[in-house]
UniProtKB/Swiss-Prot annotation:
Protein name in UniProt: tRNA (guanine-N(7)-)-methyltransferase
Catalytic reactions of this protein: guanosine(46) in tRNA + S-adenosyl-L-methionine = N(7)-methylguanosine(46) in tRNA + S-adenosyl-L-homocysteine
Presence of the UniProt keyword Zinc in the record: no
Encoding gene (name): TRM8
Function in brief: Catalyzes the formation of N(7)-methylguanine at position 46 (m7G46) in tRNA.
tRNA-binding as UniProt keyword: yes
Span list, region Disordered: 1-52
Chain residues that bind S-adenosyl-L-methionine: 106, 129-130, 166-167, 186, 264-266
Similarity-based family: Belongs to the class I-like SAM-binding methyltransferase superfamily. TrmB family.
Pathway entry: tRNA modification; N(7)-methylguanine-tRNA biosynthesis
InterPro entries, per the entry: SAM-dependent_MTases_sf (IPR029063), Trm8_euk (IPR025763), tRNA_(Gua-N-7)_MeTrfase_Trmb (IPR003358)
Family matches, as CDD domains: AdoMet_MTases (cd02440)
PROSITE patterns cross-referenced by the UniProt entry: SAM_MT_TRMB (PS51625)
Amino acid sequence: MGKIEATSKEEKLRVQKEAEARRRAYRDLKKEARQMQKEVKFDTDDNSELPKKRFYRQRAHSNPFSDHRLEYPRSPDTMDWSKFYPQYYDSESKKMTSEVEIADIGCGYGGLLINLAPEFPDKLLLGMEIRVQVTQYVEDRIIALRNQYRNELQNNYQNISVLRGNAMKFLPNFFHKAQLSKMFFCFPDPHFKQRKHKARIITNTLLAEYAYVLKEGGIIYTITDVEDLHNWMVKHLEEHPMFERLSKEWEKQDKCVSIMWNSTEEGKKVTRNKGSKWVACFKRLPTPDDCE
């Protein structure tokens, strides 16, 4: 009996190792292709297949306070956006022709980015994600879509990109004051334990930074399937002097609310499980004269 159990455990371990080896080989292949795509324009005849999510396994959440050895610019002026949006880079002036205007904080597998891209063809959208494998998946997904739609004049996904970053620590390193018009916080980590609430993506301290990078009239979009987290985010945003909640009527008419309702992987899962979703949107108010 003992030998049978030992053999079963060894077989299970062997299968797990083989599966991990296949995932690693797949990711290495995509990484090599990703590096090649960054060096060339998308004018070849090959068809890039969309990446397979099962090869990019990752924990559901990541500790934002950990040292993730992230690369980030010293200031927005030193950030090189050309490799993220090559079609928006003017090689003669060596400057970008447009700035990032819409940010998806904790973009997950990129569903919202990809659905928003055709709605804002003249604006640059950026997804920020802290998890390594998930970021690589979104990057591979965008590269594949750019290849598939390279002959389209519009809706060719050149206006979206993703970077691995920690928005809770380094957001002002990437964006100038009043640069963004929209920020999305879709199904963030709820951090249920009270001692973990400081790690939530909406806090008084972080709202000051969001107010800094948002332009006057800019919108913060939030959606979650956790009512307690929804109440937490609403409470902190309503208490902050630089934000004002938008009405339910406004939410019903806004196309971004409709898109984010069911475009993310988490949102689709909640729908499949017939769960509830809570939405709240807030407008960035003008800065008082005595604060400028």
